[in-house]
Amino acid sequence: DQFAADDNWAAAQKLASRYRQDFATYQRFQQRADFIGRVHQLITSMTQLLGSPDDLIKPSTKKLATGLITDAKSALAFSPTLTKLSTALNERLTSYTTPLDIIVVSDNVTFVEVKSVGQVGTVAQKTIQLLPGDYVFVGKRKGYVTIQVPVALRPGDSGKEISVIAHEQI
């Protein structure tokens, strides 16, 4: 209990694991050990996600982060560390699920599309919305070499200009 009170969940987890067998018949100890294990696991998982934020581009990781934040709600009062991590992960998740305004610049003759997303069309300039992620912009024009422009969009990239112009003749 002292380790938990000190917000040292790793040490509390180690101690609870060590004595779990000795107190196998004590339901209260087992419940407390389960709770300590749960808080420790939440802290560990959230720390890992915050350490590699670009993983939040993947839908499965977004779902995992949402689940962790939800699971942590009942334990926030017991751990300032968990509260801090949960808040940080929630803010990070929000930044990766907020669409960005991206400005596509072309020459009014190149047909532009975003691979696996959709068509932009033949435009001089158009603002589209995309979530943070990795994209390939494709420019096609009859009689010209098709170009591909790989773009990594991250939170804060709103307003970024992407130029897609097929200019090399076949």
Question: Which stretches of residues belong to each language-model region?
Answer:
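Short loop/turn and low-complexity linker motifs enriched in small/turn-promoting residues
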Residues: 6-24, 28-41, 45-170
